[in-house]
Swiss-Prot record:
One of its GO terms (molecular function) is chorismate synthase activity. InterPro entries: Chorismate_synth, Chorismate_synth_AroC_sf, Chorismate_synthase_CS. This is Chorismate synthase. The lineage of its organism: Bacteria, Bacillati, Actinomycetota, Actinomycetes, Mycobacteriales. It comes from Mycobacterium sp. (strain KMS). It catalyses: 5-O-(1-carboxyvinyl)-3-phosphoshikimate = chorismate + phosphate. The gene is aroC. Homotetramer. Pathway: Metabolic intermediate biosynthesis; chorismate biosynthesis; chorismate from D-erythrose 4-phosphate and phosphoenolpyruvate: step 7/7.
Amino acid sequence: MLRWTTAGESHGRALVAVLEGMVAGVSLTTEDIGAQLRRRRLGYGRGARMKFEQDEITMLGGVRHGVTLGGPIAIQIGNTEWPKWETVMAADPVDPAELAEIARNAPLTRPRPGHADYAGMLKYGFDDARPVLERASARETAARVAAGTVARAFLRQALGVEVVSHVISIGASTPYDGPPPQPADLTAIDDSPVRAFDEAAEKSMIAEIEAAKRDGDTLGGVVEVVVSGLPVGLGSFTSGDNRLDSQLAAAVMGIQAIKGVEIGDGFETARRRGSVAHDEIYPGPDGVVRSTNRAGGLEGGMTNGQPLRVRAAMKPISTVPRALATVDMTTGDEAVAIHQRSDVCAVPAAGVVVETMVALVLARAALQKFGGDSLTETRTNVESYLRAVAAREPATAQRAQASG
């Protein structure tokens, strides 16, 4: 079973990602991870941290000479600002007198509405929001992206699967409603300042961000991930936790600030009649074909051979420059929420993180289905399965009967 976890704090020495269960033989380099982390820093409306934040990547284990070894893979992402935070975020005890002289160590007692501050302070018994926000910060997603890079490499090399994303809308911008992008479109999408797949949608998104900047506010939005090349049959209908859509939804909802997920046409499907809600099946020369993909590539919890489409709704960033009303947890008095350096909009980057979680879930499902200790073995199993599926396709079966 493919498993992953991360460790570390936003201003700590480093973040660490550990991925266990990956097969041996997958080509992977530090530059592969660096390229994905640079994509995570993309986007119009990002804060000052993105301008100087450099992800110092170190492969700690599980990879040798650019190839995975089959054991747990550990990846470290160093914090270039660590010297500024070394005392405040030290793991070992520090003299209170020394801490008292450091301004950035001042207790944060005014929780931000919409953030983990309030519930985290009460749940864990903290009198300072610092321990909460350090781990709850979206900076943690850098470690996930590192782990997801391994999953992406496996999916591409074992099955020929490609994962792309684009921004549908930001704030109240006019949503993109055209055809989904193809893998070849990813470079053009990343070249867009808001990772849009349409020039008109891009202009509308930028206008929204500019307005929010002027007003001292923040914005959320909607992103879509499209996955091509998936075979029929990943996931299962046999139980709820084996359904691929439940796994995808859980993984995407686990991303900071994500408040909603839909597969395919999702909530729009609920407003349609059944006669126009589903993807009708027709005979084709090499099996069945469909003229629509409203289901988004999943039926009954399983991939159906069409592109997978997953959308995620990101709420506006909770660190709002104009400061929201809150209560000081020490005094109980009315206050304004703490404000630290933050983005106006991080939706373009969220698309990359959603790609990551989708890739991890799909890699896990593929390894459950096809197994193997090495990439070569997994490929052999994939090819055998694809031949068996092709033989069961109506057109293929009919030809076999006719020739027999």
